[in-house]
Amino acid sequence: LQDFPQAWAETGGLGRAKCQVPIIIDLKPTAMPVSIRQYPMSKEAHMGIQPHITRFLELGVLRPCRSPWNTPLLPVKKPGTRDYRPVQDLREVNKRTMDIHPTVPNPYNLLSTLSPDRTWYTVLDLKDAFFCLPLAPQSQELFAFEWRDPERGISGQLTWTRLPQGFKNSPTLFDEALHRDLTDFRTQHPEVTLLQYVDDLLLAAPTKEACIRGTKHLLRELGDKGYRASAKKAQICQTKVTYLGYILSEGKRWLTPGRIETVAHIPPPQNPREVREFLGTAGFCRLWIPGFAELAAPLYALTKESAPFTWQEKHQSAFEALKEALLSAPALGLPDTSKPFTLFIDEKQGIAKGVLTQKLGPWKRPVAYLSKKLDPVAAGWPPCLRIMAATAMLVKDSAKLTLGQPLTVITPHALEAIVRQTPDRWITNARLTHYQALLLDTDRIQFGPPVTLNPATLLPAPEDQQSAHDCRQVLAETHGTREDLKDQELPDADHSWYTDGSSYIDSGTRRAGAAVVDGHHIIWAQSLPPGTSAQKAELIALTKALELSEGKKANIYTDSRYAFATAHTHGSIYERRGLLTSEGKEIKNKAEIIALLKALFLPRKVAIIHCPGHQKGQDPIATGNRQADQVARQVAVAETLTLTTKLEETNLTTNKYAYTPEDQEEAKAIGAILNQDTKDWEKEGKIVLPRKEALAMIQQMHAWTHLSNQKLKLLIEKTDFLIPKAGTLIEQVTSACKVCQQVNAGATRVPEGKRTRGNRPGVYWEIDFTEVKPHYAGYKYLLVFVDTFSGWVEAYPTRQETAHMVAKKILEEIFPRFGLPKVIGSDNGPAFVSQVSQGLARTLGINWKLHCAYRPQSSGQVERMNRTIKETLTKLTLETGLKDWRRLLSLALLRARNTPNRFGLTPYEILYGGPPPLSTLLNSFSPSDPKTDLQARLKGLQAVQAQIWTPLAELYRPGHPQTSYPFQVGDSVYVRWHRSQGLEPRWKGPYIVLLTTPTAIKVDGIAAWIHASHAKAAPKTPGPETPKTWKLHRSENPLKIRLSRV
């Protein structure tokens, strides 16, 4: 303290870096000031941090300010004392400032650069290190906080003038600044090693004298540069010191008792978050725990938030085992990067374990204990391949300690031969390339001879050690789930079957089916639930073929690579890795894969053979595969259908029919005669089918063809059967077919009604955008306004269809000239339904009516005017040769405003009470023209108005008072889908009708109103077998009723 007073915080006061410029904090481009009020603070806490705030104000570290930024101050109580320290919550500020790449050293490998020969140490901890760096004035207001101190007259905001604690970039900024200031010391004193971790310094020297000299020069350098060390925490020239939680002595390192005690006092976790905290704290010490990954394996399953948290005995055992391993943690040697390393590796049950060592005389001294859990893919490999994955993982981890020094790898397996010649059935090319690039680095990594017993294999393991073996021979003999499973056909097979699964989209629904055939007959076929994938269908078909071949010799062909690989290779891999993917998630089609693996052992002998799909040849394999594909597609359309019969044996005419009395009466009515031999009713050589069989036949034929009523009736007439009242049954079946209802054309015809109009000019307008081609000077559209009373039209060229343009023309053109509209009608275009347009209407009190979607007739007046304007512009363009159609728009509007309607009146005459003064354009003005008497002119206008308004009254006669369509609330309807593409259905539904108007309906599930012409009634019953009526029963309880089928 006396020799270097400027280097110590106790004698030199607060430090300030003399060679560092003020730091400027960069904000993100979109950052805005954030202001968070101060949290409530107890009186004890306020009084506890008040001395610190007062001291910082006196030292100039804090200053008063007024800033739009504000973050709260948190008082944190120091453990074991009654003292508080102020901590600022800068999380919101951190979100709004630019990130910089962190260059702070990694404490995991920082000591790897320290030579074990330097056994004298000095440890210095800089006091208030961040406050040594000044903060630029323009950046100081970012860190403002509220503070009140009535005794000093302070009530407002304070901010820091130095780099604050809690700021995310403070460690990196200070670490870089201190490195720059100590560069000269490192170059001038090579006899010592100086390690720096932010504000913690470690100086190591080979002798006590060198350590003392280096410490003096370091203290002088710190004092001259403006830094201050804490004398209370200093450890000067000692052979045993504590640094970064480690005890260093004689080239070795231990865990400090404080760190071990911290882990030992952690209570059992109560939730996944506490499990992760424990594993993180204990994981910092994993270098000292042999087999850490194996001990902690049961706890990793509890770290997932999605899984239920259940603390069991195995978890408690793993929890206590980790604590016990820490209490007996050994001493590890410091890595000497001037000497080579040896890594002993072993793998058991998916856990890689290793011991990194260096020679110390005749002994191998441990430097680190490494352990890691293999990923689910590697865990499913044979042991001779798992060791390759384990070696790659541990070599990568050891590189943090070896820092590129030569490394010798020793395992119980012939690892180098495995890496160079790996069976491709187990490992992908990408993963193999990664392993080879990592392990076949001959300049750095060498492989020692396989050793069955090494320090890694002697680590605690739950099973006995393996005996010596030949890895390549073991891999060659490793097979799939069943050892005798072949991929070539058996010459003595009892049968050869072909399997296939089909999955495709039909009417918006994914349908699927599976089949097993022998090339001539259907062995088994079944429709699968909607949404079943093609891969799942293939697995189901192959599994069923194996089950039906129980106890037999079978050749089974499949064109699915997925099913073939699952049976031969992947199934065994899935079984080894616990049916998990490489990401640790459950595999798809898990149940089907398990069923397939079980069914593989049912046949006495089996060969699963892959064949190309969709071949056109006539050989048995191509024919059988095509038949399997066709049958699978056919059964996919059925709701629930399972076929196990042979096609040739199906003969409908041999069945005996049961005729009910009603069926017999109908047969007699059409003149049929009972055949005494077959007991069938026949007419003209055709069998009269009973109603039940006839209905089933019609349903099946319609399911195959989906023909209309007339065509289906003609098709039935060509069969050997006669169906009484066939038209009624066909109508019943086709009307209940949901597929036909969704696809067939046809809608409800709605007669034209009366369009709502204004009762005087300027009251009711219809507006619309229409595109005009070719575009000119960026103008693409016309915004058209039509007065529904007079037919008067206004049109304005625009570049875009925007709500801003609609509002602008209403306020600047329509309102000043014609008055405030009461009603505006339009389609559902974005410019009309936007908040701008609708907000303007609400503000002005305008009733904005949106017409039915995809119903241009609802806006018929303005739609017809669009056509008129564009046709007129086309003609004028051809006559004049002008390309700028905007210059011709006024002439087109003149024509539209003076075209007579069906009553012989023009919009101009209706609006102004007379024809336009076109005739005066040809006559010159004469001063001798008599002046018009005003009174006579007004009387003439009155007469003209009476003459004009009489025919206009015809437009306002009430229309048909009844609803023009048959829909009622509660009915089921199909709604036309206007956006159907490709093979999608034209109609969606059915939907329930909720509300009705004379021209539109509102249905459940669709927000917009639907015009009645865009809907059609759905069948009242889903099928002919469903009862048609329900009966209502009262009960004694007035709030309870009972429904029953009739």
Curated annotation (Swiss-Prot):
Superkingdom, natural source: Viruses
Annotated ranges, domain RNase H type-1: 491-637
Binding site for Mg(2+) 2: D500, D629
GO MF term list: DNA-directed DNA polymerase activity; metal ion binding; nucleic acid binding; RNA-directed DNA polymerase activity; RNA-DNA hybrid ribonuclease activity
Database matches in PANTHER family: LRRGT00076-LIKE, POL PROTEIN
Family recorded in the similarity comment: Belongs to the retroviral Pol polyprotein family.
Function summary: During replicative cycle of retroviruses, the reverse-transcribed viral DNA is integrated into the host chromosome by the viral integrase enzyme. RNase H activity is associated with the reverse transcriptase.
Protein's name according to its UniProt entry: Pol polyprotein
Organism: Feline endogenous virus ECE1
Gene name as annotated: pol
